[in-house]
Design a protein with these regions (language model features):
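N-terminal helical capping/dimerization or prosegment-like subdomains
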Residues: 1-66, 232-236, 250-256, 262, ...
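Glycine-rich phosphate-binding loop signature in dinucleotide/nucleotide-binding domains
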Residues: 50, 140-144, 306
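Active-site metal-coordination/substrate-binding segment of hydrolases
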Residues: 55-117
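Hydrophobic/aromatic beta-strand patches that form the interior of the parallel beta-sheet core
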Residues: 55-57, 119, 149, 310-312
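Metal-dependent amide/peptide-bond hydrolase catalytic core
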Residues: 65, 160, 167-351
């Protein structure tokens, strides 16, 4: 699997440009005798007894574009002192090849209590319409999944909940006038009332894993020149939604309390979680793995509603999107071994 990861690093796969890495993954599966189907740049394979509930093993093969600060070619896989350097090594190449290794380990087994679906998805880094969203829309409607494991760098600990995201474009309205006269209605002042509400409001329900819904005003714009009272003030609010609410519930509560016009850019990046008493979580706890709530987004947010899910994978999220990104070779080897054992332990608990 190390060689496969090196091939993936060496093949550019920026979001919406993942065709070449999709072909590599497809070829590896076909060479192992697995029937594969492509949906755009998503690669999907099924294994086990098709009549049984479905466990989804998913990770993404797209990457961000490299930023400044790299000391070598981001697409040249270099191993030094036990570290494999290269773009996508940590996010999320290691988790992807871990998922693939586990799928190949189990895919011919029909005696397991669950069947398997392996999905290497595109456009994760941009939450695109042609990644996990496409599979949810076009594939998992026909063949529903029952539980999902998303491969991301978590240090092989279990991220059992993930916040959703809404970005709100807000507009406070006023009436223009000359700043030298007592006229007009200043939209900037009107916006301050709502901005203060966003700063201080606390939602009633708290997630035991993710804590409170978090709202942050991140941008503001008003006025055209110094002597004109602004008739509109635009501001942006970043809302991180916990699994204690749906995105719609949070939006409706906001709309009840503020006077500004609100336009959500998207409602589809939903919070996600898995119950603490799920066999998958209990299996991890039995093995000594820890649980936590993740502040970062993944393809979990685009899964079908009500599908329990968690994130796990080798590597460290802090290394993602950084110059000289790397993954420990031993991290990868240990991760594959741990993940296969996690699935075996979960399956045993379900029998």
């Amino acid at each position: 699997m190390l060689e496969l990861l090196q091939r993936l690093i060496a093949t550019p796969s920026f979001s919406r440009e993942e065709g070449a890495t999709a072909e590599i993954i497809e070829d590896v599966l076909q060479e192992a005798g697995v029937k594969v189907k492509r949906y755009g740049n998503n690669v999907v394979a099924w294994g086990g007894d098709a009549s049984k509930p479905v466990l989804l093993l998913n990770s993404h093969h797209d990457t961000v574009r490299p930023g400044a600060g790299w000391t070598h070619d981001p697409h040249l896989p270099v191993t030094n002192d036990g570290k494999l350097f290269g773009l996508g090594s940590n996010d999320a190449g290691g988790a992807l090849v871990m998922m693939l290794a586990a799928f190949l380990h189990f895919h011919n087994r029909t005696d397991l209590p669950m069947s398997l679906c392996f999905a290497a998805t595109a456009e994760e880094e941009v939450s695109g319409e042609n990644g996990m969203a496409m599979l949810t829309r076009d594939v998992f409607v026909e063949r529903p999944i029952n539980v999902a494991i998303i491969g991301e760098p978590t240090g092989m600990q279990m991220a059992i909940a993930e916040k959703g995201l809404m970005v709100l474009d807000c507009v406070a309205r006023g009436r223009t006038g000359h700043a030298a006269r007592n006229e007009g209605v200043n939209a900037l002042y009107a916006s301050l009332i709502d901005i203060e509400w966003f700063r201080t409001h606390r939602f009633e329900r708290t997630s035991p894993v993710l804590g409170n819904v978090k709202m942050t005003v991140t941008q503001i714009e008003a006025g055209s020149q110094h002597n004109v009272v602004p008739d509109s003030c635009r501001f942006v609010v970043d809302v991180r939604v916990t699994d204690a609410y749906t995105n719609m519930e949070v939006l409706e509560e906001i709309q009840r309390h503020v006077a500004c016009e609100i336009t959500p850019r998207s409602m589809r990046l939903a919070p996600s979680s898995i119950p603490m008493d799920h066999p998958l979580v209990l299996a991890g706890i039995e093995m000594g793995l820890t649980t936590y709530g993740s502040p970062t987004m993944s393809d979990q947010s685009l899964l079908p509603p009500d599908v329990p899910s968690m994130k796990i994978g080798p590597g460290d999220s802090a290394r993602s999107h950084t110059p000289d990104e790397w993954l420990g070779v031993q991290e990868l080897e240990d991760g594959i071994e741990t993940f296969i054992r996690l699935l075996e332990t979960m399956m045993r608990r379900m029998v």
